[in-house]
Every structure is written in structure tokens, then in C-alpha cells.
Amino acid sequence: MELSALQQLVKERYFKTDSERGIFHTALWFHEEVGELSSAIASGDKENAKEEFADVLMWLLTLANLMEVDIQQAVDAYLENPRKNPAK
């Protein structure tokens, strides 16, 4: 699935609830998921880490939706930025 399609899917499924929760509380959920991912990585629990990677991605897309950021455009701009490319 392409990133833009995934962002749209997240919007269709969760935008109403996410909007009601608000950006601040949604950001707190995102931080909690990042913490859970960090714990899974630190403990070497690959199976749990896989689940947490997905959680973090979904919450990131949720935040992007709430802020009306097209994540595909943001990623494309990042990749085109010469300062973000590793030195050769």
C-alpha cells in the first residue's frame, strides 16, 4: 500500500474520533506509542517491535491528518532536500 493511500485509510477510519480527542491528546498517544516501541527495541522483542512500529506509523499519520499535512508530499520534499541526503 502506498503511503498516501494508507494516510487516507487512517483518515477514513479514525478522523472523527481523532478530531474529538484533539491534537494535544493525540500527540500524547503518539508519544506513548514511541515509548512502547523504544521499550520493545531495548528488550530485543522483535515481535512486539513489529506491532509497535505499526502503531507509531498509524499515530503519525493521524497527527498528519489533524494538521492537514500530506505525508507523501512531506516525505518527497525531505528526500529531494540535498541537506538530507548522505554525503557521497
Task: State the predicted function of each range.
Residues M1-F53, L57-K88:
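Flexible "arm" and connector segments at domain edges
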